[in-house]
Amino acid sequence: KSTANAMVAKGKGILAADESAKTIQKRFDKIGLKSDPDTNLAYRKMLFTTPGIENYISGVILFDETIRQSIDNVLIPEYLSKKGILPGIKVDKGTVDLPGSLGEKITEGLDGLKERLKEYAQLGAKFAKWRAVITIGQNLPTDKSIEANAEVLTKYAALCQEQDIVPIVEPEVLM
């Protein structure tokens, strides 16, 4: 409960710094930067070491690469925690087409999630994020899509709670 309350502290927000390698590469390509672990870390270090960031940010969603990196020889989750910022982790593995649907999506990542959550908790994660994509359109979403995504989100949330990790459910609605 204290983690959930801290996440929604008045006047603060959650910073999504969970770009995948593919997404961060696209962003860096636009400005002529090469994406590699060192450059990605330098970018995130710039964000996390911003003076006074803790006055505006209650939590940061990290990517798997980032939760394992260090700033000044301190693991990033510990670095953020020392500033009073909750470290979180993106745990879904992206979307694929929902079989038998009209191009609707289902999110992957439940396989091995229990073990990954145990490791992320040991690394200092206090919350996790899982994205489900719901498409709105003519005859969409289908009941099948809603039910399949709800089932996956329920399993994700239950696994998080087993590890004392607060689950964030992110329904991404596409119109």
Regions found by a protein language model. Name each.
Residues V91, A132, P171:
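Short glycine-centered, acidic/aromatic-flanked micro-motifs in structured strand/loop junctions
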